[in-house]
Amino acid sequence: MNRKKLSFIFLLLLSLNISAQLIVSEEPIVLKTKTGDIFGSLKAPNSKTPVPIAIIIAGSGPTDRNGNSQLTQNDAYKMLSDELFYSGIATLCFDKRGIAASQSAMKEESDIRFENYIEDVKEWIDLLSNDKRFSNIIIIGHSEGSLIGMIAAENNPKVTKYISIAGMGLPFDVILKEQLEKQLAGQPQVTKDLIFSYLDKLKQGETISNVPPTLNALFRPSVQPYMISIMKYNPQEEIAKLTIPTLIIQGTTDIQVPIEHANLLSVANPKAQKVIIENMNHVLKDCKSSDMAEQTPTYSNKSIPLNKEIGKVIINFIKN
């Protein structure tokens, strides 16, 4: 066989090997719970030695394992997990109970509690810790998932590192009051007082009866137990309990979670590393403006790539 043929065969084999490495290997995974199955996607690089695995926890609302919902289609979590995969880090993304494929794990809205999400993550940790393909477990929580993740990681020897992305730095009721204060501008004071009194009552663990129809969307009886359960937690107090390496990431053009929240979390856990990413918004995409008209396309266009810095920051933190 002449030298040209050998060179051609070598280049062909090399290209096939590179192509194989670029294909994301994804397998379905199921967590069995007492109330139903929770479905996820596991991406594990082909490796002869164990690799780290990151559990990515979605934010609030009907956001699925890829970062999408009926109103938003941005593939943020899918893009992040793919980037970690290419760097040799395995990932688990899952539909939280009651969401997408895991819909049946929540029979009724009134059944769900914030603690259910925490316990689910703990069970995922237990499941993955028995998989010999993985060397250590990292928790990545986005938005509301940040609080879920930090509580699940507390005093858990199976978790080696924790990452908060756009995490809340204030209790849920405080955030809700701040948002409503802006939305209720111009409304009668009596309306504002009534709404805030309802929030105070929920904070005390009390349910509200005879909610006016105009306020039913926010205070419907079926959602009150969940609101009571999440109001128990203060993110600053929870992140202060973490003794493992911790990374706090925040974008400068996030219109849902201001930078102040990252600062509050950082003060609460001084040993944590804080990274502020310029022009990154809440869905981890580039956006130079906080104007809604410019933000909207990043929430609903899958072709817009992930911010270039966030993957590098996370990979460096996990590997070092």
Model region roles, listed by residue range:
Residues A76-Q103:
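Conserved alpha/beta-hydrolase
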Residues L242, I248-Q250:
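Short beta-strand/loop motif that positions the catalytic acidic residue
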Residues I244, V257-A268:
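Short alpha-helix in the alpha/beta-hydrolase fold that links the catalytic acid
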Residues E109-N130:
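Alpha/beta-hydrolase active-site loop
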Residues K48-L84:
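Short, surface-exposed "cap/lid" segments of acyl-processing enzymes
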